[in-house]
Every structure is written in structure tokens, then in C-alpha cells.
Swiss-Prot record:
It comes from Paraburkholderia phytofirmans (strain DSM 17436 / LMG 22146 / PsJN) (Burkholderia phytofirmans). Belongs to the CTP synthase family. UTP binds at residues 13, 191-196, 227. The gene is pyrG. Homotetramer. GO terms for biological process: 'de novo' CTP biosynthetic process; pyrimidine nucleobase biosynthetic process. Pfam families: CTP_synth_N, GATase. GO terms for molecular function: ATP binding; CTP synthase activity; glutaminase activity; identical protein binding; metal ion binding. This is CTP synthase. The lineage of its organism: Bacteria, Pseudomonadati, Pseudomonadota, Betaproteobacteria, Burkholderiales. Its EC number is 6.3.4.2.
Length: 557
């Protein structure tokens, strides 16, 4: 039978519940347990697909095409279990399901209320999510409850967790509460009162936490832990200090050293073998002792909010581990490139243009792509970054000066990137789309396997085929491909059924490393293995860096 660990948060948001939950899962998995994770989001949106990156950060896409919270990306990076649609749900989905049942008459004329109908539905979603785990029936399902204790939006989820714990009985569920212990500089001390009040609020709901994870910018002294223990009624050994670390991959060892996994296993009456965190130690060792160093410029419009590119940043870190290369990421505002030119790019070892939506900043990205192509600087374009690379090539090499995407210019006669007219909705149904259609749940989403053209750089990187995740509405227009190929561009991978371009590259006779991909490879990168595309990209950046390095006196050029 699956046992449950509920992870809640208090005082403020963004303390790192997702990292804490994923780190605990990694430790339990290293002890031989089958583990899955779920994220419950209290907002009323059906999913984060139409939410602004400034509001929500990255939208992580699962293998089966769900647009989910970025924490699911952390889950997949920390454990081997793949996430699915059922691993993330929102208040919007819960109410949508309950209202659909009410309209069908499933409640037999009863008054539909938050308790029991909404809370029962939440419990059903949790159990369904755990049962759908790709690892088979999990020994432990870790459930992260979004939001902060005290928020009105979170109350139904916390009540459902309380009811579920009561229904399942002792040793079947436990609660981990993550809270803030701030350092007040004027007083010169850590303050435990916010944590005390947060636990008090949780206990008012009927939940007594078994473990407290106390976030601070430094290690919490034992006397402060004892004070927190006394006021929160949590054993002192279960008051665990979680201080700021320079890498999230140090957190599993930090939590294990303080006995978190032992406390959880004791509470749930689990008897797995000892933890083996050598893989995490090896990864941290690689991260901290690189042999080389490169600087990669990420040209985008959300550069002030790096949460928007969370998986991409982590994918570059994974590549750095597996190539012994420190990767410095410089975030470059594409609108500044539009107004100030490409001078800010000239010291870079490689250029990356990530995915995105909307017209703002696109001409700056195109200018950066033109610079990378002409200066022979390694270039990787992802999703929109590939589409803009095709537009730049069409304009500046093929000679279609007004080439554009219909996303940015409906009137352009040279629609080298355009909206395709048939989509799959959230339930997998084929649906015709137009420019006026709703935005939510109407993109090409999820994993798709496609063959790779033999003899290409893509084949060197991936092998015979590629299986990656998508999130986009627009495609490279096949009508212009013959002209692009005549100019030298190579379409190195296509979808097997729709024959849509998935990868493009320039031959080495034109450029040493210039690749665009319509999919999002960052979603499948893990610290365990890295990702072949990002490893190849970092290696190309290193080769460029070494080629540009000045030759020392006495050395042969």
C-alpha cells in the first residue's frame, strides 16, 4: 500500500518546497523505495499554460503533454520516475471535475459543498496520481501542497490532507512543514516567532507536523532548534536546519546528514536499506571542480526572471558537470540588442535563444542569431529560437527580406513560420484551430519521436531518432523548405506523420555548430546523465573559446 508524505509551507512562499520534496524523494529512492511526487496548486487556473512567466515562472511539459508547475521539473531531475498529467492538479481542475459531476447528476440532488465534495475530489485526485506512477505502485507518494498555510486558497487542500491522514490511519501518512527562520540584521539574531506562529496556524487546521524544515540563510544553532521544538511540539531531532546552498544538488546530502529520511521511514514504518548518495556527491564534485570555463549568452525577454528558464538553466548545469566545464550564463535582454546592437555578444563563447511567445524583442533575437551565424559562434535555438533562426536565414541568406512568422506579422507574403490548423486539446481530441481560437490547451504538446536524417550533426548528437517534448503553436512552413535548403540550410529531423520540420542545422562548411530544434530538450535533461544536445553545445562553446584564446609566446599557433 502506498504511504503519503505531505509537504506544506509557511510564513512566505518561494522557500523551496519543491526542492525539499524532490530531495527527500531522491534520498528515499536511494534507499531502494519506489517514489513518486505530486504537486497541488491552489490557483483557479485549469493549468499554468496561459499564465505569464512573470506570474508563474516556467511551464514544465510532461511526457504525456501536460502543462504543469515548474516543480515537476525538479521532481524529474531528482528521481527516475517520470511525471504525468495526474502528478499536478489545480483548484480549477478540481472544481471543473466536481461541476461536471453535478451537471451529470452524480450527486443525486445533494447540495454540493467544499466539504465533503471538493475535499473528496482532492483525495481522489491524489490517490489517482499516486496510482498512475510510472514506477509501478509506489511505496511512498510525496505530495507538495502549493501556497502558504493561512492562505484561503490552500484550505481545501490542507483539509483534504488531514482527512486522508485520518482515514488511512497511523503510520500511513505524515506531514513535513517547511518554514522560514529569518535573520534580523538589526538585532543580530535569528527569529523563531514566524515559525512558531506558522505551526500554530497549521495545528488550528488539525494538522500536527512530524518534521519541521527550517529555512535560513545560515545553519540554525542547536539552542534555537530546541526553542522551536518546545513551542511547536515537534521533537528536537525532527527540527531540521535547511540553510542556503550554492547548488540544489547538495540538498539531499544536507537533509540525509540530519536524519530526515530516517525520521520519515520510522514514522511510516518502512524498513529500506541504507541510503547511497554517492551519485549526488560525485555530481557536486564535478560541479565544483571543472577543468574548463565558457560563457554562454541567453538572449531572451524574461532575463530579469530566471525562473522562466529554470529547466534550461539546469540543463546547462548538467552539461557542465558531464563536460568538466564551468558554464557561466549571461542573460541578455533582446530588446536591448534591438536598440544597442550586438556589441554585448562579442565576448561570448556561444549564443542560445530559448522558447517564447509574442512579438516583443524578436528583432533583437534575430540580430543575435545573425551575429552568431556570421561570426561563426556556436548557436542553439530552442522552439522560437529555431523559428527565428529560419526567419533570419530566409531574410539574410535566401533573400526573402520580409520573411516572418504570422505570429508577428499577419500580412507578410513570405510566411516561413505559420500557424498549423489542426491541434490536439487537453483530452487528446483533434480540434481545428484558427488565429481567433482560445490559447489554453491548444498547442502541440508532449513527447514525439521522429527519425533523423543520416549524415547530419543531429545524427551525431542523437543517433537514429529523437524523442523530445513540444510546446508550441507555430511551425516552419514546408512551402519554403526547398528555398531554404537551396540556400544551404539542412532540415535534419521531421515528424513521421505530419512531415513537420523538427530540427535544422547549417553544414559545417557554413558554420562549425549551428542547430535549431522545435522541441524543448531541456525538459528531459537530468543531472544523472546530462543531455546529448546540451553536452554537444557546451563542447562546441569550449572549442570556440579555445580557438579564440591568444597563443602564448613560444607556442605554435
Amino acid at each position: 500500500m502506498t504511504k503519503y508524505v505531505f509537504v506544506t509551507g509557511g510564513v512566505v512562499s518561494s522557500l523551496g518546497k519543491g526542492i525539499a520534496a524532490a530531495s527527500l524523494a531522491a534520498i528515499l529512492e536511494s534507499r531502494g523505495l519506489k517514489v513518486t511526487l505530486l504537486k497541488l496548486d491552489p490557483y483557479i487556473n485549469v493549468d499554468p499554460g496561459t499564465m505569464s512567466p512573470f506570474q508563474h515562472g516556467e511551464v514544465f511539459v510532461t511526457e504525456d503533454g501536460a502543462e504543469t508547475d515548474l516543480d515537476l521539473g525538479h521532481y524529474e531531475r531528482f528521481i527516475s520516475t517520470k511525471m504525468r498529467k495526474a502528478n499536478n492538479f489545480t483548484t480549477g481542475q478540481i472544481y471543473e471535475s466536481v461541476i461536471r459531476k453535478e451537471r451529470r447528476g452524480d450527486y443525486l440532488g445533494k447540495t454540493v459543498q467544499v466539504i465533503p465534495h471538493i475535499t473528496n475530489e482532492i483525495q481522489a485526485f491524489i490517490e489517482r496520481g499516486a496510482a498512475s506512477a510510472t514506477c509501478g505502485e509506489p511505496d511512498v507518494a510525496i505530495v507538495e501542497v502549493g501556497g502558504t498555510v493561512g492562505d484561503i486558497e490552500s484550505l481545501p487542500f490542507l483539509e483534504a490532507a488531514r482527512q486522508m491522514s485520518l482515514r488511512m490511519g497511523r503510520n500511513s501518512a505524515c506531514f513535513v512543514h517547511l518554514t522560514l527562520v529569518p535573520w534580523v540584521a538589526t538585532a543580530g539574531e535569528l527569529k523563531t516567532k514566524p515559525t512558531q506562529h506558522s505551526v500554530q496556524k497549521l495545528r488550528e487546521i488539525g494538522i500536527s507536523p512530524h518534521v519541521l524544515l527550517c529555512r535560513a540563510d545560515r545553519r540554525i544553532p542547536d539552542d534555537e532548534r530546541a526553542k522551536i521544538s518546545m513551542f511547536s511540539n515537534v521533537p528536537e531531532d525532527a527540527v531540521i536546519s535547511v540553510w542556503d546552498a550554492d547548488s540544489i544538488y547538495k540538498i539531499p546530502q544536507m537533509l540525509h546528514d540530519q536524519g530526515l529520511d530516517a525520521i520519515i521511514c520510522e514514522e511510516l514504518k518502512l524498513t529500506p536499506h541504507a541510503a547511497d548518495l554517492s551519485m549526488w556527491s560525485d555530481l557536486v564534485e564535478k560541479l565544483e571542480h571543472p577543468k574548463h570555463e565558457v560563457t554562454i549568452g541567453m538572449v531572451g525577454k524574461y532575463v530579469d526572471l530566471t525562473e522562466s528558464y529554470k529547466s534550461l538553466i539546469e540543463a546547462l548545469r548538467h552539461a557542465s558537470m558531464h563536460t568538466s566545464t564551468k558554464v557561466n550564463i549571461e542573460y541578455i535582454d533582446s530588446e536591448e540588442v534591438e536598440t544597442q546592437g550586438v556589441e554585448s555578444l562579442k565576448h561570448l563563447d556561444a549564443v542560445l535563444v530559448p522558447g517564447g511567445f509574442g512579438r516583443r524583442g524578436t528583432e533583437g533575437k534575430i540580430a543575435a542569431i545573425r551575429y552568431a551565424r556570421e561570426a561563426k559562434v556556436p548557436y542553439l535555438g530552442i522552439c522560437l529560437g529555431m523559428q527565428l533562426a529560419v526567419i533570419e536565414f530566409a531574410r539574410d541568406v535566401v533573400g526573402l527580406k520580409d520573411a516572418n512568422s504570422t505570429e508577428f506579422d499577419q500580412e507578410t507574403p513570405n510566411r516561413v513560420v505559420a500557424l498549423i490548423t489542426e491541434w490536439y486539446d487537453r483530452e487528446g481530441r483533434v480540434e481545428k484551430r484558427t488565429e481567433e481560437s482560445d490559447l489554453g490547451g491548444t498547442m502541440r504538446l508532449g513527447s514525439q519521436r521522429c527519425p533523423i536524417k543520416p549524415g547530419t550533426m543531429a545524427e551525431e548528437i542523437y543517433g537514429k531518432d529523437v524523442n523530445e517534448r513540444h510546446r508550441h503553436r507555430y511551425e516552419v512552413n514546408n512551402r519554403f523548405v526547398p528555398q531554404l535548403e537551396a540556400g544551404g540550410l539542412i532540415i535534419s529531423a521531421r515528424t513521421p506523420s505530419e512531415d513537420l520540420p523538427e530540427m535544422m542545422e547549417l553544414p559545417r562548411s557554413m558554420h562549425p555548430w549551428f542547430v535549431g530544434v522545435q522541441f524543448h530538450p531541456e525538459f528531459t535533461s537530468t543531472p544523472r546523465d546530462g543531455h546529448p544536445l546540451f553536452k554537444s553545445f557546451v563542447e562546441a562553446a569550449l572549442a570556440h573559446h579555445e580557438a579564440q584564446a591568444p597563443v602564448a609566446v613560444g607556442e605554435k599557433a
